[in-house]
Amino acid sequence: MEEEGKKGKKPGIVSPFKRVFLKGEKSRDKKAHEKVTERRPLHTVVLALPERVEPDRLLSDYIEKEVKYLGQLTSIPGYLNPSSRTEILHFIDKAKRSHQLPGHLTQEHDAVLSLSAYNVKLAWRDGEDIILRVPIHDIAAVSYVRDDAAHLVVLKTAQDPGISPSQSLCAESSRGLSAGSLSESAVGPVEACCLVIMATESKVAAEELCSLLSQVFQIVYTESTIDFLDRAIFDGASTPTHHLSLHSDDSSTKVDMKDSYDADASTFCFPDSGDVGGLPPLPFCMQTSPHSKTVSESELSTSATELLQDYMLTLRTKLSSQEIQQFAALLHEYRNGASIHEFCISLRQLYGDSRKFLLLGLRPFIPEKDSQHFENFLETIGVKDGRGIITDSFGRHRRALSTTSTSTINGNRTTGSPDDRSAPSEGDEWDRMISDISSDIEALGCSMDQDSA
């Protein structure tokens, strides 16, 4: 009987009733899986480099890009050179060997990167639970590294930006798996930073993401320098007899203004990422170090501040007190909605032919959306670089920003580690900062009325 029973159970033969039941169950499982993986469309734009988005889109809105989130490495030495492919891959490989970063990427690692002028936010693609949020002023550098078939985008940030130290270091630990902390025990007591590791589907997607971040850095830099210019004008026009100095207001809404200006102290590097001689491409790297502490960064920041001081002192030597007040009034009108064309024409009339070269010094303070019109205006009136120290300095300074897409890594400039101090980064803090600038200029207008009376 047992033998007959065994003979009856032939392998590969399934009862018709069981086949129908299994087919129905598989169909239900497939539909359930499709329901789970159904994803909303992203709030995004498609760029064809070197195309750029409207600055207002980043200031008042946000852009989403799909990435794969590998994880976050903490306690990385602050002296890490973000433009060095070898150094970055050293830490990534070490983390993979210790299972802190995934060796193989799956659908579970899919994430959404949300980018604005205030912060970078990462959330899981399914469920959209927030992984971390990094304020822009906590980002020291952005690098693109090609590792075989993987296209990695790495953010060098302040230690534990936007998350508590107890949170996970990588995608697996965020999903409930255990993971330790990556630390270089051989390194002495140096400031630490973090590396946020992401992957994109292609080189084009990685470069597009880096381009967007580069534009964010430039927008933040422009707003910060305009703030400095407004304060410097207010300082020089309202009290023309005392020595001009740049300062940060002591109020809570105007902190770390010098640190914000430091963003321009370092470089944005965009090396050619094509393969050379069979070697992997160098990283596509952008650096902005709002809180850097190295000597070279400090010197660069001092130099940038001195350029601004020199320009304001030049205005005081070339313009009368009344003309400086007129300049402040024109700037106030421009910041409150006047067109760049009106601003340029009015400044041209104020400066006259003999002083029109002073317009070159305004280059770093013109918002990106108006920069092309400003450059065209300079060409129209015959203003070129090379008219003295001030104009040369500002001319070189502006070109360094405008030609980032073709510059190469020099390998000698490193980024100091950002510290973990807080600074205004959310929308309300940003709005209050801009409002404070307008208030300063309005106060300048009141002092002008009193002087004329």
From Swiss-Prot:
Tissue specificity comment: Highly expressed in heart, lower expression in kidney, lung and liver (at protein level).
Ranges where the record places region Disordered: 1-36, 401-432
Location of the PID domain: 59-248
Bias-annotated ranges (Basic and acidic residues): 22-36
Biased composition regions of type Polar residues, renumbered to the chain: 401-417
GO biological process entries: blood vessel development; blood vessel endothelial cell differentiation; cell-cell junction organization; endothelial cell development; endothelial tube morphogenesis; endothelium development; heart development; in utero embryonic development
Sites of Phosphothreonine modification: 403, 408
UniProt modified residues of type Phosphoserine: 15, 164, 393, 402, 405
Major subcellular location class: cytoplasm
InterPro entries: CCM2_C (IPR032375), Malcavernin (IPR026159), PH-like_dom_sf (IPR011993), PTB/PI_dom (IPR006020)
A GO CC annotation given for this chain: protein-containing complex
The family this protein is said to belong to: Belongs to the CCM2 family.
Record note on domains: The C-terminal region constitutes an independently folded domain that has structural similarity with the USH1C (harmonin) N-terminus, despite very low sequence similarity.
Function: Component of the CCM signaling pathway which is a crucial regulator of heart and vessel formation and integrity. May act through the stabilization of endothelial cell junctions. May also function as a scaffold protein for MAP2K3-MAP3K3 signaling. Seems to play a major role in the modulation of MAP3K3-dependent p38 activation induced by hyperosmotic shock.
Subunit: Part of a complex with MAP2K3, MAP3K3 and RAC1. Binds RAC1 directly and independently of its nucleotide-bound state. Interacts with PDCD10. Interacts with HEG1 and KRIT1; KRIT1 greatly facilitates the interaction with HEG1.
Name this protein carries in UniProt: Cerebral cavernous malformations protein 2 homolog
Source organism of the structure: Mus musculus (Mouse)
Gene (name only): Ccm2
